């Protein structure tokens, strides 16, 4: 089972995608593996976990700590730090903007902290105008990018040498 739309806003598409979870044959499962950060909806994730537990099915939760589950969390910080260092130290870019995910989202905040730290270590300036929030998704990241472009064209903000994005969806947008 997989989702391809954001679950944090209810739409006809998200309702349709959520319906796939109603046909999970819990009585036939040896375990349920949930990609918590992909679903990004606590109500949906918690409902899946509750139904699995009701049917005595163990749950493996990836990237979202959930009580009563086998939780697997990855260390994305080190690999993201390598990306930021590569752009700054290998390519010599010192005017770098950052496209973060959601505000107050653990993944986004960790990556933003890493960006700020590595920029500072390399003597690079970080201003709030160099940071935008693209919500890990195409439409918000496109809107943030268009705002930056308008500022650059108007001469109210400097054009960066590089833009680092917190995830691949925002980078390819």
Residue ranges and their predicted role:
Residues 1-12, 18-31, 38-173:
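Bacterial carbohydrate/catabolite-sensing allosteric modules
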